[in-house]
């Protein structure tokens, strides 16, 4: 899985500070795609300018990057890791698949800026995220969740 390896080569800086980078990912997601903020009711009362410094946003961002790191390290053998994530996001949180595509774009930009992910790495990340998101989509369908 060359694409996974290429992305993992730049994962170290992201992993070194999940909270800071995760906060940056979520804050940028909410800025570039404001409609996504409504999917996070626990952040509803936070002023847009305060999102970046909010401990809850930072903690959730850290969780996102931690889970993504686990999926990357599985190098495609991620079904056991992905199933519970798909299940909670489909049945409990009701997150449409398109939102994973949006956050994947943002993660790519943040990795470019903070971890030196070059053009080839960006392509590898898009390929990896396409695999993960396609597998999530299959899980969603299995669970009967359609957007």
UniProtKB/Swiss-Prot annotation:
Heme b binds at residue 89. One of its GO terms (cellular component) is sarcoplasm. Residues 2-141 form the Globin domain. GO terms for molecular function: heme binding; metal ion binding; nitrite reductase activity; oxygen binding; oxygen carrier activity; peroxidase activity. Its EC number is 1.7.-.-, 1.11.1.-. It catalyses: Fe(III)-heme b-[protein] + nitric oxide + H2O = Fe(II)-heme b-[protein] + nitrite + 2 H(+); H2O2 + AH2 = A + 2 H2O. Nitrite binds at residue 60. Pfam families: Globin. Monomeric. Monomeric heme protein which primary function is to store oxygen and facilitate its diffusion within muscle tissues. Reversibly binds oxygen through a pentacoordinated heme iron and enables its timely and efficient release as needed during periods of heightened demand. Depending on the oxidative conditions of tissues and cells, and in addition to its ability to bind oxygen, it also has a nitrite reductase activity whereby it regulates the production of bioactive nitric oxide. Belongs to the globin family. This is Myoglobin. It comes from Chionodraco rastrospinosus (Ocellated icefish).
């Amino acid at each position: 899985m060359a694409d996974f390896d290429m992305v993992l080569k730049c994962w170290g800086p992201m992993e070194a500070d999940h909270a800071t980078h995760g906060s940056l990912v979520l804050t940028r997601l909410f800025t570039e795609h404001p409609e996504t903020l409504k999917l996070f009711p626990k952040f509803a009362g936070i002023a847009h300018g305060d999102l970046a410094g909010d401990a809850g946003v930072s903690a959730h961002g850290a969780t996102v990057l931690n889970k993504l790191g686990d999926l990357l390290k599985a190098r495609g053998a991620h079904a056991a890791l992905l199933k519970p994530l798909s299940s909670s996001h489909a049945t409990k949180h009701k997150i449409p698949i398109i939102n994973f595509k949006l956050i994947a774009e943002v993660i790519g930009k943040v990795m470019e800026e903070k971890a030196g992910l070059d053009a080839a790495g960006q392509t590898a990340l898009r390929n990896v995220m396409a695999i993960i998101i396609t597998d999530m989509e299959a899980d969603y369908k299995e669970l009967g969740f359609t957007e």
